[in-house]
Swiss-Prot record:
Role description: Involved in the regulation of the intracellular balance of NAD and NADP, and is a key enzyme in the biosynthesis of NADP. Catalyzes specifically the phosphorylation on 2'-hydroxyl of the adenosine moiety of NAD to yield NADP.
Species in which this protein is naturally found: Clostridium botulinum (strain Loch Maree / Type A3)
Subcellular location: Cytoplasm
Presence of the UniProt keyword ATP-binding in the record: yes
Annotated binding of NAD(+), by residue: 61-62, 134-135, 145, 164, 175-180, 234
Keyword terms of this UniProt record: ATP-binding, Cytoplasm, Kinase, NAD, NADP, Nucleotide-binding, Transferase
Main localization category: cytoplasm
EC number(s) reported in the record: 2.7.1.23
SUPFAM superfamilies: NAD kinase/diacylglycerol kinase-like (SSF111331)
GO process annotations (BP): NAD metabolic process; NADP biosynthetic process
Pfam families reported for this sequence: NAD_kinase, NAD_kinase_C
Protein name, UniProt field: NAD kinase
Gene name in the database record: nadK
InterPro entries in the cross-refs: ATP-NAD_kinase_N, ATP-NAD_kinase_PpnK-typ_C, NAD/diacylglycerol_kinase_sf, NADK
């Protein structure tokens, strides 16, 4: 492992001293290591990134999401040093950075392949790069008026309801927006997709888990303005068509997980027992 990328979120408190220390830790483990620094993921999606052996993310969970989308096509593993609020995906705290880098070069880690989503807008020829690690959300616009949705799974009608929106989430995203919408926490290596309605006007409409290979079609039957498509809470697009197709992407996010990190402990400390507001990024 000689080619290391570092992706820095410039909105976070990351001093030059912190970066110098990380350079030092890397070169202590491998004096020949080549380090390339990226800022706010700019240039990370270029073909040259394919040569990277790993990318360290200095930021929070939101920075991990952006990094995952940028690197998805290149199969480059990533891990995060938490400089955000929650640190569920970016699980390494700054004081443990040296130990994590040592374990990285010793090979004392495993790689988790996380499902990603892709989205197609019916009737639009141009294929935009709608990839998501957490979730893809279709919601009403600015008006406080609900929208009528009809859901099809593998071209079979599932249900129709009125609601503020619909979340389609991966297991990774099950601890994000869909959790707030009443969805279950899904163990991250399961091959499933989740549909979670947002504020449905019905007591009988509840989140559902589907086979990971399912194709989900969301049809907008009644609207007062164009709904909005949101990718991982970071990218959005007004939807002028009446149907959105969401399915599992052929790409996966490769997350580096160190052996001393326990998913259930992280779940307890970062989600279950967390009392202060999760501000996110």
């Amino acid at each position: 492992m000689k080619n290391i990328g570092i992706n820095i979120n410039t909105d976070k408190d990351i001093s030059r001293n912190i970066l110098d220390k990380i350079f030092q830790y890397i070169h202590e483990e491998c004096s020949e290591a080549k380090i390339k620094v990226f800022y706010d993921s700019k240039g990370l999606d270029n073909e040259e990134s394919r040569a990277l052996d790993a990318v360290m993310v200095l930021g929070g969970d939101g920075t991990i999401l952006g990094t995952a989308r940028a690197l998805a096509k290149y199969d480059v593993p990533i891990f995060g040093i938490n400089r955000g609020h929650l640190g569920f995906l970016a699980e390494i705290e700054l004081e443990d950075c040296k130990k994590a880098i040592k374990n990285l070069f010793k090979g004392q880690y495993k790689i988790e392949n996380r499902i990603m989503l892709k989205c197609d807008l019916k009737g639009i020829d141009k294929k935009d790069d709608f990839l998501a690690l957490n979730d893809i959300v279709l919601t009403k616009g600015n008006l406080s008026r609900i929208v009528k949705y009809s859901i099809y799974v593998d071209d079979v009608w599932y249900t129709t309801f009125v609601a503020d929106g619909v979340i389609v989430a991966t297991p990774t995203g099950s601890t994000a927006y869909s959790l707030s919408a009443g969805g279950p926490i899904v163990y991250p290596d399961l091959d499933v997709l989740e549909i979670a309605p947002i504020c449905p006007h019905s007591l009988g409409i509840r989140p559902i888990l589907l086979n990971g290979n399912s194709k989900i079609n969301i049809r907008v039957l009644k609207k007062y303005e164009d709904p909005v498509l949101t990718i991982d809470g970071q990218r959005y697009k007004k939807v002028t068509v009446n149907e959105v197709t969401i399915s599992k992407s052929e790409y996966k996010c490769r997350l580096i997980k160190f052996k001393d990190k326990d998913y259930f402990k992280i779940l307890r400390t970062k989600i279950s027992y967390r009392s202060r507001e999760c501000e996110g990024e």
